Regions:
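Short connector loops at helix/strand junctions that flank enzyme active sites
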Residues: 19, 29, 57, 79-83, ...
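Catalytic strand-loop segment that frames the active site of acyl-thioester-processing enzymes
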Residues: 19-49
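Short structured motifs
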Residues: 18-24, 82-88, 109-111
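Alpha-helical membrane-targeting segments
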Residues: 1-19, 41
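Hydrophobic beta-strand-centered segment that forms part of the acyl-chain substrate-binding groove
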Residues: 65-104
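HotDog/MaoC-like acyl-thioester-processing domains
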Residues: 92-93, 103-155
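Hot-dog-fold acyl-thioester-processing enzymes
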Residues: 41-63
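Residues located in well-ordered beta-strands
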Residues: 23, 85-87, 99-101, 127, ...
Length: 155
């Protein structure tokens, strides 16, 4: 998924993410980076970024990476966040980049889901850092992946 396709996807499926200022910074098989800049539309009363905007950027860094692996697999999967936790270590101001580098773990979970037919869960970590490289937040998302039957087949 390139930036143009990402923007089209966000505008049509999750427009609040675009309104909040989420941007795809980098995506390859190994990882994904999402960027969001603190501003009037995503602020909280404490002069920093609203925590849910941070969570949205963090979730996108894991979900877009999973989506890439699903598309490249040629198979169909259902994917769902089944758990989430977060810690916040510093006020989020300026530009924050959320990074997930667990593409290999996603690929392994998808492969196992396809081979066994059983849903697989994988916990993915997304770390948000500010412009100085300091960590502002850490999110953990547990994703469940279930292989679906190929189109045109029935059970």
């Amino acid at each position: 998924m390139n930036r143009l396709l990402f923007n089209l996807f966000v505008w049509t499926k999750v427009p609040i993410a675009k309104i909040a200022g989420l941007r795809l910074r980098h995506l390859d098989d190994a990882g994904c980076q999402m960027q969001v800049t603190h501003g009037w539309l995503n602020q909280n009363p404490f002069k920093s970024m609203f925590w849910a905007v941070e969570g949205m950027a963090a979730e996108f860094s894991t979900g877009i990476l999973a989506h890439r692996h699903i598309r490249r697999s040629g198979s169909r999967y259902a994917m769902l966040v089944v758990a989430m936790s977060a810690t916040f270590s510093k006020k989020a101001v300026g530009t924050i980049v959320f990074r997930c580098d667990q593409g290999a773990a996603i690929a392994a979970a998808l492969r196992l889901a396809r081979e066994t037919g059983a849903p697989q869960q994988v916990e993915l970590r997304s770390v948000g850092t500010d412009e100085s490289g300091e960590q502002v937040a850490e999110f953990f998302f547990t994703w469940s992946f279930k292989a679906r039957m190929p189109l045109g087949t029935s059970q």
